[in-house]
Curated annotation (Swiss-Prot):
Name the record gives this protein: Mitochondrial fission regulator 1
Species name: Homo sapiens (Human)
Family: Belongs to the MTFR1 family.
Keyword Phosphoprotein: yes
Keywords assigned by UniProt, alphabetized: Coiled coil, Mitochondrion, Phosphoprotein, Transit peptide
Localization of this protein: Mitochondrion
Basic and acidic residues bias: start-end ranges: 288-307
Coiled-coil residue windows: 137-169
Cellular component GO terms, alphabetical: cytosol; mitochondrion; plasma membrane
Alphabetized InterPro entries for the sequence: Mtfr1
Phosphoserine carried by residues: S119
GO biological process: aerobic respiration; mitochondrial fission; mitochondrion organization
Length: 333
């Protein structure tokens, strides 16, 4: 059987005019001799099939409602039209679908080129231009203005709520006083003590004046010395300053009436109303806490008592007797 097949193949190659050795061993990577099928096809006299040709029409001459039925040749436009038709059992050409006269909406649709619907994005389309920074700044300013308006409205609402609560508390207090009698209000806190009057300021002298007087005395006493000797610059002595420290008195500075008087508060300012309500609330809490501590009689700790009594000063230094000897030496000289 195999021998018969070989003889048949040899007979076919002999009729074609191709040797068996050249078919099996001589190969080229290109042309008609690269495979047996191509060699046979080039030597056989076969009739070629006609190629399919498509007619591409422009959009202007595609189809016009004035001449229906003239454009009956299938083109690539029909392919796009068929791809767009959904829910149809069979494909139809444009001439069959557009047998009726189109409306105005259809004319606008016909002017556009039929295109197939694809899910992938079209990269050929131009990207939308980004907003300029000026427009972004304007939008940010508008948002900021809107937020400021909302904050002002919230402040006004909070101030209104505070005033309503105060009015309700006042009315409730009046009703309680009429029914159960008036309760004496808590006395206001005492004002801070006034500074002591400045008496005897002209009698006491400052440390600077004493130093000046002693310098003048020394200058008068030093005139008897020899004028040729160079005079060394005198440095202030701290012992002299410390000696007269107890006789120094501070001046009392009176505050002006403008600083003492409180600033006028606008009754319509929502921030001022809120601040006043918070002050009242926390003052009431602080007063109640202090009253509870007084009633309970909580003793203060030893550290607090010592911190209140002990003050830093020269009385904390240990007496050595050296300071007294130095002061006596200075006074003798």
């Amino acid at each position: 059987m195999l021998g018969w097949i070989k003889r048949l193949i040899r007979m076919v190659f002999q009729q074609v005019g191709v040797s068996m050795q050249s078919v099996l061993w001589s190969r080229k990577p290109y042309g008609s001799s690269r495979s047996i099928v191509r060699k046979i096809g080039t030597n056989l006299s076969l009739i070629q099939c006609p190629r399919v040709q498509f007619q591409i029409n422009s959009h202007a001459t595609e189809w016009s409602p004035s001449h229906p039925g003239e454009d009956a040749v299938a083109s690539f436009a029909d392919v796009g039209w068929v791809a767009k038709e959904e829910g149809e059992c069979s494909a139809r050409l444009r001439t069959e679908v557009r047998s009726r006269p189109p409306l105005q909406d259809d004319l606008l649709f016909f002017e556009k080129a039929p295109s197939r619907q694809i899910s992938l994005p079209d990269l050929s389309q131009e990207e939308p231009q980004l907003k300029t920074p000026a427009l972004a700044n304007e939008e940010a300013l508008q948002k900021i203005c809107a937020l400021e308006n909302e904050l002002a409205a919230l402040r006004a609402q909070i101030a209104k709520i505070v005033t309503q609560q105060e009015q309700q508390n006042l009315t409730a207090g009046d009703l309680d006083s009429t029914t159960f009698g008036t309760i004496p209000p808590h006395p206001p806190p005492p004002p801070p003590p006034l500074p002591p009057p400045a008496l005897g300021l002209h009698q006491s002298t400052s440390a600077v004046d004493l130093i000046k007087e002693r310098r003048e005395k020394r200058a008068n006493a030093g005139k008897t010395l020899v004028k040729n000797n160079p005079k060394k610059p005198e440095m202030p002595n701290m012992l002299e300053i410390l000696k007269e420290m107890n006789s120094v008195k501070l001046r009392s500075v009176k505050r002006s009436e403008q600083d003492v008087k409180p600033k006028p508060v606008d009754a319509t300012d929502p921030a001022a109303l809120i601040a006043e309500a918070l002050k009242k609330k926390f003052a009431y809490r602080y007063r109640s806490d202090s009253q509870d501590e007084v009633e309970k009689g909580i003793p203060k700790s030893e550290s607090e008592a010592t911190s209140e009594r002990v003050l830093f000063g020269p009385h904390m230094l240990k007496p050595t007797g050296k300071m007294k000897a130095l002061i006596e030496n200075v006074s003798d000289s």
